[in-house]
């Protein structure tokens, strides 16, 4: 167990569903805080057993074959964490406790170990124990739709928010909780840029608001500019070779937008008070904005209504 008194003053916890989610969605943020002296703890909820395999010689590892992909992805995730400078990684409940549920509506949702079926309080208890150990001031996870509707992402959100509630009762919940997001203006700029191109990732989309992760700019709370870490993020993504092929549209976008795409990440604020910001919407440039060195007592929800 980690002795919290030996950890850096700024402690960030991220809760993700599968290996590779951390790199794609929050890799620059993680690398930024790791490089600037923060303690970054990554929790991954499943091994990603139901993922596709984009490395031909490893195709038989897939769930329909040898069903060994999850074990292989442990190594990919370890390599990604090294690229990001993250040394504290945990699997929720231990590696293999929860299984990748697959996409919504598939029979894999009903697997006995599917994360989608996990008892909420039991799963949250694993996260509460980690919070008690590390005492993060800031937690990052997904919104209630799991960013794009994958059952494991939705469940990661539910587990993280339930863990927050349970930890709050004991007095050590994070002071701020953020959800990953993508501003509408950024998506609209991307749609304009790729219109008519052969590798258009927005093909078939008429308006940005059709995308499940589109967030109005005025709802964004933080813009983390970690462009200096764009190479670390890309290296972490490339570590997940079974999931992200070299010809992925993600790298195509990166080739066009460079460090802006790889190094800038956005968040909405679900819990806590928004700190000082800039620009027309007062976007924070630091997830710890407004917090003292140690976690403060303000754990009120910010503009979030209804159940998590």
Curated annotation (Swiss-Prot):
Q: Which reaction does it catalyse?
A: 1D-myo-inositol 2-acetamido-2-deoxy-alpha-D-glucopyranoside + H2O = 1D-myo-inositol 2-amino-2-deoxy-alpha-D-glucopyranoside + acetate
What's one GO MF term for it? N-acetylglucosaminylinositol deacetylase activity
Cofactor, free-text remark: Binds 1 zinc ion per subunit.
Q: Does the keyword Zinc apply?
A: yes
What Pfam families does this protein's entry cite? PIG-L (PF02585)
Please give the positions of the paired cysteines in each disulfide bond: none
Q: Could you say which enzyme class this protein belongs to?
A: hydrolase
Q: Which cofactors, by name?
A: Zn(2+)
> What does the record list as GO biological process?
mycothiol biosynthetic process
Q: Which UniProt keywords apply?
A: Hydrolase, Metal-binding, Zinc
- Entry binding sites for Zn(2+): 18, 21, 153
EC no. given is: 3.5.1.103
**Family (UniProt):** Belongs to the MshB deacetylase family.
- Known function: Catalyzes the deacetylation of 1D-myo-inositol 2-acetamido-2-deoxy-alpha-D-glucopyranoside (GlcNAc-Ins) in the mycothiol biosynthesis pathway.
Q: What is this protein called?
A: 1D-myo-inositol 2-acetamido-2-deoxy-alpha-D-glucopyranoside deacetylase
**Provenance organism:** Salinispora arenicola (strain CNS-205)
């Amino acid at each position: 167990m980690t002795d919290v008194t030996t950890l850096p003053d700024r402690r960030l916890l991220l809760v993700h569903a599968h290996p590779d989610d951390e790199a794609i969605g929050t890799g620059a943020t993680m690398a930024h805080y790791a490089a600037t002296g923060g303690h970054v703890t990554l929790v991954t909820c499943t091994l990603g057993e139901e993922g596709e395999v984009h490395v031909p010689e490893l195709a038989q590892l897939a769930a329909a074959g040898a069903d060994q992909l999850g074990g292989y992805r442990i190594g990919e995730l370890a390599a990604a964490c090294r690229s990001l400078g993250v040394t504290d990684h945990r699997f929720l409940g231990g590696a293999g406790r929860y299984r990748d549920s697959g996409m919504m509506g598939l029979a894999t949702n009903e697997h006995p170990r599917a994360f989608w079926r996990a008892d909420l309080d039991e799963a949250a208890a694993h996260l509460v124990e980690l919070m008690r150990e590390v005492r993060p001031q800031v937690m990052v996870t997904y919104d209630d739709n799991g960013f794009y509707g994958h059952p494991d992402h939705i469940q990661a959100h539910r587990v993280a928010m339930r863990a927050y509630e349970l930890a709050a009762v004991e007095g050590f919940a994070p002071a701020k909780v953020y959800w990953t997001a993508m501003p509408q203006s950024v998506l609209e700029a991307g749609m304009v840029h790729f219109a008519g191109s052969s590798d258009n990732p927005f093909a078939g989309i008429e308006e940005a608001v059709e995308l499940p992760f589109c967030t109005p700019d005025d709802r964004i709370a933080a813009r983390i500019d970690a462009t200096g870490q764009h190479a670390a993020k890309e290296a972490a993504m490339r570590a997940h070779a079974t999931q992200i092929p070299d010809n992925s549209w993600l790298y195509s976008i990166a080739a066009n937008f460079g460090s802006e795409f790889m190094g800038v990440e956005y968040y909405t604020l679900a819990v806590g008070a928004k700190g000082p910001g800039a620009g027309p919407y007062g976007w924070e440039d630091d997830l710890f904005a407004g917090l003292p060195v140690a976690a403060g007592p303000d754990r009120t929800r910010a503009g979030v209504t209804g159940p998590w």
